[in-house]
Amino acid sequence: MSRGQWAPAGELPWERNLFGAESAAVRLKDGRVLIAGGGDERLGPQDGTALFDPRAGAWTAAAPLREARRMHATTLLADGRVLVTGGSGRASGFPVRPLDSAELYDPTKRSWSDGGRMGQARCGHSATLLPDGRVLVAGGTTARSADSERSLASAEVFDPESGLWTPTGSMTDARSLHPAVALPGGGVLVAGGWAATRRDWRTGAGLAYCERYHPSTGRWTVTGGFFAARTGHRLTTLADGTVLATGGGDPDAGTQGRPDPYSRATAERYDPATGTWSREADMPCGRALHQAVRLPTGEVLVMGGTDDTLGEAGYRSTARYDPRFGTWTEGPGMAVGRIDFAAAVLADGRVLVSGGSVRTGPAAPTGSFLRLTRTSELFTA
């Protein structure tokens, strides 16, 4: 019998796809949740922002971004402001039109201000808060030519006090659409992701390579890699400082005669002390483009997602991982299956999921690339 339950949590002011948007939902210091930007049903970049009030259980429209964007990164700063970086400024098409701009949201003023310009325009990158309050932006995708893209190894750091961007050491491997998490002791782990190798992003190479950033030196070092390449996966930091990687798939698998139609059900656990990954029990089913959060109990809740090959329909299913025993149990299903959606843990421990795609491609309505949802749901353990 599954534990916990889902309940409706109002609707966003608009439908939104959040593909490639790192940390799309950010919980503010006052407990509200902010979602900014994203794509419409044709993956056109949007400037709309919204705030969820847990006490009212409702969403309200907030001040729009200064520049419409999708595939961007959203980071909560130590002073309570929110940093939005990069992204793509064009609709679905090839190549992307990456942005170098950044914006800062001040919850007290309820407005956005200029966050300066990065040294490199990028989308599908990671943006991680460092212990000293700065933000590390790494990797992503940019245009290579008029009809091709390339992944980036470069990284840069934003200082909220000065408002300045400075370059830092480059990663060993160029990558985009990769998750990144802060480690105990101040380092940052980036794991897996995607590397552009051809004109079509669907046939890029999935990566098993992982590396760590050291803020004290501004350098990267390679660390243990996954047992299998992953993209569209999630990283979740556990209470003991280890990191759980779940799901994803290898976009190049089909071209190498190794189709992975249902995505990876496998999970791996990273130990920062040894720099190695260990195999964990498989999830009840494979999934990519899902969300995963740590619950107040220490367990990990994995939600939604889709298969890695076509990704035509969002999953309603959820699963819970108990790190004490290394086991998975099936959780209660969401009311709406969703892909590329936002998720955040509220101050009271409930989990909010919002937006995303319900169906894509041939499974979506005629004349639309995506079937989106504006619905939100709350999970109570």
Place the predicted regions along the sequence by residue.
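Kelch-like beta-propeller repeat domains
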Residues: M1-A381
